[in-house]
Amino acid sequence: MLLELLLASVLGFVIYWFVSGDKEESLPLEDGWWGPGSRPVGLEDESIRPFKVETSDEEINDLHQRIDRIRLTPPLENSRFHYGFNSNYLKKILSYWRHEFDWKKQVEILNSYPHFKTKIEGLDIHFIHVKPPQVPPGRTPKPLLMVHGWPGSFFEFYKIIPLLTDPKSHGLSDEHIFEVICPSIPGYGFSQASSKKGFNSVSTARIFYKLMLRLGFQEFYIQGGDWGALVCTNMAQLVPSHVKGLHLNMALILRNHYTLTLLLGRRIGGLLGYTERDMELLYPFKEKVFYSLMRESGYMHIRATKPDTVGCALNDSPVGLAAYILEKFSTWTNSEFRDLEDGGLERKFSLQDLLTNIMIYWTTGSIVSSQRYYKENLGQGFMAHKHERLKVHVPTGFAAFPCEIMHVPEKWVRTKYPQLISYSYMPRGGHFAAFEEPELLARDICKFVGLVERQ
């Protein structure tokens, strides 16, 4: 009798798992108000205003004075980047920042694309909107929303934008031409931060959906990595009929019984359908998954619990802010860069570009609000949000970059995104795909869009 009850329970669980998992359920769209105080009476101002990044001599002088008052602790002998950012190499970066980096010139570069702001749910939302310089007769550019993560910004997309808006001039096929919109997540860079608790990725997705409607787009493509991947996923869950296609270079697969099979070992993994490339990227399991996640997720626990405390230090010290952020651009680009004295930073990025991203955080004072995003999204615990339990029912493409913090096999992606139509093993690259390998990412986006358009 007990055996029969046990078997019936297991069978019931299996049926529930598959039935509940396959149900095409979307998130409720709802509404919100995140500005200070109560929502005012009347309609919100929906005007779209031109915006320019600005700076001043006072801002630059203050930065230089703070750098001049540096107080560093010498690194341990032969520690390289295993203890975090190596202060010997940090001295080189600070010297460049203080004496060679030209913030005014970088502001001009930032302003080379059109910037705008508009009020949505009480927040001033910043975005860049880049249209193709020319469109062949009879063609219409495809709207593409691209969403950044942490510790990046809208600046991550500056090198990929011309490949998408003007591909022919950059040696790429012009079969697909895009009109690119890159917003700043509220609390990041030039987008106003929420004044209230609870502003998470779903709230962001809803605001960005309203932004696209305000720009006149009823249907559009979306792309993201890091937090951008979650925001875009939530958009597809909120308004699937408006999302023509979802392209990701990172996936947060939380409800996934397949992950347990990794513990069975490499040979069993092969029998369960993982490819040889999956095996290379996931094994040895302890080093490439367990230890890797332990090494790289410490910051996340602080932010998901008490983000404001460390934020006080980072918002007051440009040196501390730079070390904190640049360390991620080292090991999240390639974990083996821990073994290098300079963290491998200049192998993939220029100091000019890295410091431009730092300056966006520094001049806007947005490091604290950007960290609060972790508490709002992760602070309630595992599987606490409805969107974590829902699948995504829009055409999906995934670019698996080999040096991402953790590899996500195709069969895992498909559990969350059953309409996966494109999965690409990328030849190189890590977490910051658009910043590090813009051409590879652009080509994969175009390949995915081509598949969607031919469906």
Curated annotation (Swiss-Prot):
Gene (name only): EPHX1
UniProt protein name: Epoxide hydrolase 1
Predominant subcellular localization, coarse grouping: membrane
GO cellular component, one term: endoplasmic reticulum membrane
Superkingdom of the source species: Eukaryota
Dimethylated arginine modification, residue list: R295
Organism: Oryctolagus cuniculus
Keywords, comma-separated and alphabetical: Aromatic hydrocarbons catabolism, Detoxification, Endoplasmic reticulum, Hydrolase, Lipid metabolism, Membrane, Methylation, Microsome, Transmembrane, Transmembrane helix
Localization in the cell: Microsome membrane; Endoplasmic reticulum membrane
UniProt catalytic activity: cis-stilbene oxide + H2O = (1R,2R)-hydrobenzoin; 1-(4-methoxyphenyl)-N-methyl-N-[(3-methyloxetan-3-yl)methyl]methanamine + H2O = 2-{[(4-methoxybenzyl)(methyl)amino]methyl}-2-methylpropane-1,3-diol; 8,9-epoxy-(5Z,11Z,14Z)-eicosatrienoate + H2O = 8,9-dihydroxy-(5Z,11Z,14Z)-eicosatrienoate; 11,12-epoxy-(5Z,8Z,14Z)-eicosatrienoate + H2O = 11,12-dihydroxy-(5Z,8Z,14Z)-eicosatrienoate
